[in-house]
Amino acid sequence: MSSPGDTAVLVLAAGPGTRMRSDTPKVLHTLGGRSMLSHLLHAIAKVAPQHLAVVLGHDHERIAPLIADWADDLGRPIDVALQERPRGTGDAVRCGLSALPDDYAGVLVVTSGDTPLLDADTVADLIAGHTATRAAVTVLTTTLSDPSGYGRILRTQDNEVTAIVEHADATESQREIREVNAGVYAFDTAALRSALNRLSADNAQQELYLTDVIAILRGDGLPIRARHVDDSALVAGVNNRVQLAQLGAELNRRIVAAHQLAGVTVVDPATTWIDVDVTIGRDTVIHPGTQLLGRTQIGGHCVVGPDTTLTDVSVGDGASVVRTHGTGSSVGAGATVGPFAYLRPGTVLGDDGKLGAFVETKNATIGTGTKVPHLTYVGDADIGEHSNIGASSVFVNYDGESKRRTTVGSHVRTGSDTMFVAPVTVGDGAYTGAGTVVREDVPPGALAVSAGPQRNIEGWVRRKRPGSAAARAAEAAEKAAGGRPAGEAE
């Protein structure tokens, strides 16, 4: 049984979002590494309401499973209610009430699912203010320089809220009002239920407006309150991709600033993008053109960038990652990566290791202190500690049907242009000569050389490429040396 001290939150996410011009439901569009709806649910969960429900309509089959996943991540239940026909926000709330206990008598917060920057502090402040004043409804408002498209707040000369008029139904004088409805409310649930039963669709949209509840409750003589939010971005909604980009940039500005205040140097905030779930240690330097995405974790005293994109990558303390694209990988403490390295999923680079210029790795474990300096592909491989892989080497992992692994031991030295044809094992302390194709296992401490003796065919250029620049150069060199052209009889 509920009590007057309980809190419930309804998130309205049933609209089709046609102005997004997208096959993706509006609330699933992302900024800062999360969808708009996910941002909002994470914020609401911090308030810890007794009940949390989302009202879905358009594309509910796609959204509901994601809500279940987020509920698991947040460790709390999130109910789903369905608005089968789009009949306005008032009808959406009526549908949402079905997800609450019939006897629920606490505070009911209603918000839209397209306000991704709404934070827990703002919601908690709304609930506290509403409870303290014992109002029938408390509405969040904000002031905009361009209020086009927003419902306007109507007040008496005594500054009391009398109604909210939607933009489409507002008169010219009402459209001059810059204080707007933020779309976030706290209701006395009993009063709300009563008002919902008296809503009318006699308006420009022929819908049941939740905002009309304000005038109905005032007509009942019940107290109406408003709480103004100075930071309008916290309650800004998204209706199109221009607004999505604007809020995405604002969210990123706040994320970057928070890291800077926590001791991270961000050289150029304007070209640095950091998702909400990224962590960065103090005294790390982030250079221009860097994107840190997903659940990337950067240690302290690191150097990242410029022109680096890391998604779900962990980087240990003191590491350097320069001009690198990485996904689903791990870089050990003190390691160096780049420039122009490509870390594909499953890459694990040990402490003090090196992946140099134009190195690509995939599903590979590279041990402590091991160096892969340049121009090399390491795929499906395990390399031990303190080994060195020569330039232009390739771990040949695909036989045309399946991927196979290569194992290279510790303290191994391989020559340039070595091909490791998997499956093959190179033992500890072994060497390979330049140009070696390793098709069989190499014992520990052995030198593997696959090439035969070099054979020089004298005079080949003169005979096969007569008159060419190469032939003329060779003839001049031979004359300068006082010799007869190679291959010419005495």
Swiss-Prot record:
Q: In which pathway does it act?
A: Nucleotide-sugar biosynthesis; UDP-N-acetyl-alpha-D-glucosamine biosynthesis; N-acetyl-alpha-D-glucosamine 1-phosphate from alpha-D-glucosamine 6-phosphate (route II): step 2/2; Nucleotide-sugar biosynthesis; UDP-N-acetyl-alpha-D-glucosamine biosynthesis; UDP-N-acetyl-alpha-D-glucosamine from N-acetyl-alpha-D-glucosamine 1-phosphate: step 1/1; Bacterial outer membrane biogenesis; LPS lipid A biosynthesis
The protein's required cofactors: Mg(2+)
The entry's cellular-component GO terms read:
cytoplasm; membrane
Keywords noted in UniProt: Acyltransferase, Cell shape, Cell wall biogenesis/degradation, Cytoplasm, Magnesium, Metal-binding, Multifunctional enzyme, Nucleotidyltransferase, Peptidoglycan synthesis, Repeat, Transferase
Looking up Gene3D superfamilies in the UniProt record yields: Hexapeptide repeat proteins (2.160.10.10), Spore Coat Polysaccharide Biosynthesis Protein SpsA, Chain A (3.90.550.10)
- State the Gene Ontology terms under molecular function: glucosamine-1-phosphate N-acetyltransferase activity; magnesium ion binding; UDP-N-acetylglucosamine diphosphorylase activity
Entry binding sites for UDP-N-acetyl-alpha-D-glucosamine: 12-15, 26, 83, 88-89, 112-114, 151, 166, 181, 239, 344, 362, 377, 388
How the cofactor is bound: the record states:
Binds 1 Mg(2+) ion per subunit.
Q: Name one GO biological process term.
A: lipid A biosynthetic process
Q: What subunit structure does UniProt give?
A: Homotrimer.
Q: Which family does it belong to?
A: In the N-terminal section; belongs to the N-acetylglucosamine-1-phosphate uridyltransferase family.
Protein's recorded name:
Bifunctional protein GlmU
Organism, by scientific name, is: Mycobacterium avium (strain 104)
Designated gene of the protein: glmU
